[in-house]
Amino acid sequence: MAIKRFAITVFSIVFSLGAIAADTTPSESAPSWQADAQKEIKANNYDAAIKTLLAANQPNSADWNNLLGYAQRKKTPPDLAAAERYYQAALKIDPKHRGALEYYGELFLMKNDLAGAEQMLTRLDKICLFSCEEYRDLKEAIAKYKTKNKKL
């Protein structure tokens, strides 16, 4: 009977931790600049997203820096140096910012720095208790990078 109670307790703890880790939905009180920038990014309007974010001028926000880094990295042509500065700023504000860790890892791959990308993956692994989307996405990007570069 004690084993059954122990198993139920462990299951309950594991289940509740998984629910916490999976809850990455943006809050309803997200600032308008964030929603506007995300809308522009979704539409691949990276220059418009950059303008929206710069007008909002929220340099103490990890999300603001992360979105600016993302838009700088994805625009044509990408500004990798600017993207890196924004990702570094986001991680200085919030060292566990999962989006910044994932995207900074992808930036490292763009710069052919596999070791840097793997460092970001290791950091994500430590903060994502039972995996998370950002960890899985970066892990997949690293695997694709390795496969692509084996052929060269």
Predicted features by range, described:
Residues 23-31, 118-152:
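Terminal, low-structured helical/coil segments at or just beyond the last alpha-helical repeat
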Residues 28-56:
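Alpha-helical segment of the N-proximal tetratricopeptide repeat
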Residues 38, 70-72, 106:
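Residue-level recognition of tetratricopeptide repeat
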Residues 42-43, 74-76, 110, 127, ...:
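Register position in tetratricopeptide repeats
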Residues 43-48, 76-89, 112-120:
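Structural signature of tandem alpha-helical TPR/SEL1-like repeats
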Residues 56-59, 93, 126-130:
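Structural marker of alpha-solenoid helical repeat scaffolds
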Residues 64-66, 100, 134:
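TPR alpha-solenoid repeat register
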Residues 67-68, 103, 137-141:
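Canonical tetratricopeptide repeat
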